[in-house]
């Protein structure tokens, strides 16, 4: 009788394990095919006796549907049945990151890492937690550990560079962006970001011969990155290669006409920057070019001191009266505080930038004491 009972119990256990394995396989297939709604609809309500891995797949479905609370609920159920599987610890930690619960996330990432020490995603997620808490040294440590593992994702390479950039350590940031460029896929947004920052940081160092190819490559990959057009224009103006800048200016005007430009490019773009005495000069050009009978600014020179304060503005102003009288289209004027100055110097659309710049600098000399 005891042998029969034992055999019966073993048979029941075998059938249960077989059923659980079958359910897990089914859930894995559904998950691989991204059928997350189906997983939730068909399995979430009857998962009481499911295996740890099956519960994990249900939690993963909630994770992909951005249902944070249910995701954590099922990850906890999975962990309670099998605490040695790193996957639910990692997904729970990632969810806690999304919820802004970074200290809780850190503990879960650390548990996942203790179980499996060679997963780059785990270190990357832990780096994200520390980054959000502005613990940059610990974030760097974990992003760097991520890059030491096999199959490292793009993010740690980008974030190492970003942290150095945040800390104003531009030389280290530039080196890290070059490393990121060499490691990550050209098809990713991270590659575009690396190119832009290489161009930006090389420009800040005055290495325009290195900045130019970075922006050119970026625009070949993404012709809608209009900030890169402006950066290339600045490079060419710095080198007095005005003919090279013109096609990129035309692209910005075309994009403006189509309503494609946003934020600080919506009304104007910076086409030159230079140092004058102890001041930074930023020069902008506005897209407006229509005679509506009103005065408008076309080219604007901002004179900025070491505290980032604009101490003087010099601009070409469209003058409808001058045009009506057959004179110049633009008059060179200046503003200092509430005071407006008219130099009496005129320009037209065929102006030479070197002449405009020289005239503007004379006004800097006149009005900055």
Question: Model regions: which residues?
Answer:
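N-terminal leader/linker segments that initiate helical-solenoid repeat arrays
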Residues: 17-57, 61-66
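Structural marker of alpha-solenoid helical repeat scaffolds
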Residues: 49, 81, 115, 149, ...
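Register position in tetratricopeptide repeats
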Residues: 32, 64, 98-99, 132-133, ...
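Helix-start (N-cap) detector for alpha-helical repeat units in TPR-like alpha-solenoids
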Residues: 51-53, 86-87, 119-121, 154-155, ...
């Amino acid at each position: 009788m005891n042998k029969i009972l034992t055999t019966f119990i073993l048979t029941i256990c075998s059938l249960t394990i077989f059923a659980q394995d079958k359910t897990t396989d089914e859930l894995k297939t559904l998950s691989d095919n991204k059928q997350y709604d189906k997983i939730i609809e068909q399995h979430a309500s009857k998962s009481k006796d499911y295996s740890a891995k099956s519960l994990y797949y249900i939690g993963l479905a909630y994770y992909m549907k951005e249902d944070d609370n249910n995701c954590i609920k099922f990850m906890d159920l999975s962990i309670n049945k099998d605490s040695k599987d790193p996957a639910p610890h990692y997904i729970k930690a990632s969810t806690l990151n999304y919820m802004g619960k970074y200290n809780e996330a850190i503990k879960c990432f650390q548990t996942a890492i203790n179980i499996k020490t060679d997963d780059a995603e785990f270190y990357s997620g832990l780096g994200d937690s520390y980054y959000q808490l502005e613990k940059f040294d610990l974030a760097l440590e974990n992003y760097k550990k991520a890059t030491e593992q096999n199959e490292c994702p793009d993010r740690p390479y980008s974030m190492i560079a970003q942290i150095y950039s945040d800390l104003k350590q531009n030389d280290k940031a530039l080196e890290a962006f070059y490393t990121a460029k060499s490691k990550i896929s050209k098809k990713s947004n991270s590659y575009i970001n690396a190119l832009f920052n290489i161009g930006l940081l090389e420009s800040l160092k005055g290495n325009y011969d290195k900045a130019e190819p970075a922006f050119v490559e970026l625009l070949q990959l993404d012709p809608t990155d209009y900030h890169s057009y402006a950066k290339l224009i600045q490079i060419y103006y710095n080198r007095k290669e005005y003919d090279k800048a013109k096609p990129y200016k035309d692209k910005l005007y075309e994009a403006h006409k189509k309503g494609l430009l946003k934020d600080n490019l919506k009304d104007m773009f910076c086409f030159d920057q230079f140092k004058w005495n102890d001041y930074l000069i930023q020069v902008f050009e506005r897209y407006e070019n229509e005679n509506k009978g009103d005065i408008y600014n076309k080219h604007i020179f901002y004179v900025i001191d070491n505290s980032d304060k604009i101490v003087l503005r010099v601009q070409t102003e469209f003058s409808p009266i001058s045009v009506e009288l057959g004179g110049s289209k633009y008059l060179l004027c200046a503003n200092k505080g509430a005071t407006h100055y008219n130099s009496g110097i005129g320009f037209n659309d065929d102006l030479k930038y070197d002449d405009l710049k020289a005239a503007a600098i004379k006004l800097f000399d006149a009005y900055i004491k």
